[in-house]
Structure formats: structure tokens, C-alpha cells
């Protein structure tokens, strides 16, 4: 395993992190694709999370030296906390999560994130689910509408994060958004975040131009997600006639890890074998001729071009 730190995140985190998603038989993630409203309802727990299949994935993560773990919804938080208690890791691990029902489009204007009393209570509730006394990475994903609605929004968020750190409830904070480049740059410029959590892949690379360099200039960690484009990568591969999904996935991961500002890439896997294939890219992280050829073949597909156009518009480019 490769470990990386930055000026603001002074612990070594594994270059590949493990996401908290568990999966339905058809490959879609659990929770959101069962009932999206219930998935983000604070306190709602789906049955069957954190069972033997997930424990096998977590055990494999330990074997590979993965120390960066992410949990999204309450079902994932509770399962991760339970599994870490049942299967204590052989080294220190770092956990990221987000306030339930307060981020992205789940709360109008993300107003509750800017109220310290509500944010503090939600962080404490999440810590109880995780069985931890301090959260390593608090992810705050708010949209541009929050900034437009409240000119003091970023100041309030910054003050709240500083208080959470002083009270020992969080160690680091990560900026996140789905509003694109301009919002990320304002989050970075506020100088209250220690890292960013961002969609990044070879078909959604808008952040490479300004956002990643801006984060790196401030010593922030860059945590990348969606290397596989929520499965769109494999549909592009089918169109290009690429039958080896593992090679396609490894190529996509290598592209992300080749961006010099990237600290870690988060992956979602269903089996230990999938995780082992993903981690194997670190044995030889340089792009080989065969992998460069795979990229070119995918880039020639209509589905790739359509995906790129949509993502560039979404990112504000």
C-alpha cells in the first residue's frame, strides 16, 4: 500500500480508500436504490448491512493496508461501527462520514449545516452510530444555493468547523459539492477545510484545471470518487468491445492516481476479489501501453462523448 499525507492532513492515508456502499444483486448500491427518502432519514437502518459478505471485504481491506474508510448513510455508519468493534483493525483507521439529511439536495439551502447546535448534535449522533469519540473526516457537501441564499454561509460553516475541532469532535473537514467548479473554489478559498471530496475520472476531469491545483496550493488533501462513473465506465467498455472489466477498472483507477494532486481514490466493491483487483494497480501505477490503448478505445465511443459533454456542463465549463 502507498500512504500519502498533505500539509493540512498530516496522517498517512492509503492511496485507495474503501467506500461504505453495499450492493443489490443487480449491482446497484443498497439504500439509495431501495428507497432514497428512507436512505437519508436520520435513524433509519436497513436490515442486512455489515453481515458476512461485508465483513469479508473489510478483512480484505485490512490485509491490503487500507486505512481510509467512508460511510454515507446511517445504515453504513452503524454497520461500520459494529464491524470495527467485531473485527478490530490491526492499525489505526480513519473514518469519513457526513451529516445525515443535511447535505447536497436533502436540506433546503443546506441551512442546518450553518447552525452549530444542529450540526454538533448530528456529528455526535453519527459518532454514536460509528462507536467513535472523534470523527477523522467530516464531509460537508453543500450546494451553490446555500451560498446564494445566505451571504454569511461560509463564515458560519467555518466557525462551526473550528468549534467542532476545539471540542474534539472532528479531526479534519472535507469540502464537497455537486454544484461545480465555482462552488469548490469558494470552499477552498474560505480556508476552513482540510481536504476536498470530488468526482474525478478520465471522462469527468473538469477539476484538473483549477480545483485540484487550488486545493494542493493550500495543502489540502484531494479524495477522488466515481472512478468507475457509477457503472457508466463498463457500458462504455462494452461499446468499445472491451470484455475484460478488471483491466478497464484498473485503467480508470490508474488515470485518477496519476493526477499528482490526488491523495486517495475511494472505491466501492462487492467482494474481496474486486478489492484485490483494484489494489493491484499500486503494484505498477504507471500507465502501460495496453492501458493507454484502452483509454483511447473508450474515448472513441459515443457514450463517452455524451458523458463528457454532460459532465462539463454540470461542472460549469
Q: Which residue ranges define each predicted feature?
A:
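N-terminal binding-site loop/beta-alpha segment at the start of enzyme catalytic domains
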Residues: 1-94
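Structural preference for beta-strand elements that scaffold enzyme active sites
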Residues: 13-17, 67-68, 92-96, 134-139, ...
Amino acid at each position: 500500500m502507498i500512504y500519502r499525507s498533505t500539509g493540512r492532513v498530516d496522517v498517512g492515508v492509503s492511496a485507495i480508500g474503501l467506500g461504505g456502499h453495499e450492493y443489490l444483486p443487480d449491482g446497484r448500491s443498497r439504500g439509495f436504490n431501495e428507497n432514497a427518502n428512507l436512505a437519508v432519514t436520520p435513524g433509519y437502518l436497513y436490515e442486512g448491512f455489515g453481515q458476512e459478505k461485508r465483513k469479508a471485504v473489510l478483512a480484505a481491506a485490512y490485509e491490503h493496508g487500507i486505512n481510509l474508510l467512508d460511510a454515507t448513510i446511517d445504515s453504513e455508519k452503524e454497520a461500520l461501527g459494529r464491524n470495527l468493534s467485531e473485527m478490530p483493525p490491526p492499525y489505526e483507521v480513519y473514518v469519513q462520514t457526513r451529516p445525515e439529511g443535511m447535505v447536497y439536495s436533502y436540506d433546503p439551502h443546506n441551512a442546518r449545516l450553518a447552525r452549530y447546535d444542529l450540526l454538533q448534535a448530528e456529528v455526535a449522533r453519527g459518532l454514536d452510530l460509528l462507536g467513535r469519540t472523534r470523527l477523522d473526516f467530516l464531509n460537508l457537501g453543500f450546494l451553490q444555493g446555500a451560498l446564494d441564499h445566505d451571504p454569511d454561509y461560509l463564515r458560519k460553516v467555518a466557525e462551526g468547523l473550528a468549534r467542532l475541532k476545539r471540542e474534539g469532535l472532528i479531526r479534519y473537514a472535507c469540502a464537497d459539492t455537486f454544484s461545480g467548479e465555482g462552488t469548490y473554489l469558494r470552499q477552498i478559498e474560505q480556508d476552513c477545510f482540510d481536504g476536498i471530496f470530488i468526482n474525478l475520472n478520465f471522462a469527468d476531469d473538469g477539476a484538473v484545471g483549477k480545483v485540484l491545483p487550488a486545493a494542493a496550493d493550500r495543502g489540502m488533501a484531494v479524495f477522488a470518487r466515481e472512478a468507475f462513473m457509477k457503472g457508466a465506465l463498463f457500458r462504455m467498455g462494452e461499446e468499445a468491445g472491451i470484455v475484460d472489466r478488471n483491466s478497464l477498472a484498473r485503467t480508470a483507477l490508474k488515470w485518477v492516481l496519476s493526477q499528482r494532486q490526488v491523495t486517495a481514490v475511494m472505491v466501492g466493491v462487492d467482494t474481496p476479489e474486486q478489492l484485490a483487483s483494484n489494489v493491484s494497480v499500486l503494484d505498477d501505477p504507471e500507465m502501460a501501453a495496453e492501458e493507454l490503448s484502452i483509454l483511447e478505445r473508450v474515448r472513441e465511443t459515443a457514450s463517452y462523448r455524451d458523458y463528457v459533454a454532460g459532465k462539463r456542463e454540470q461542472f460549469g465549463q
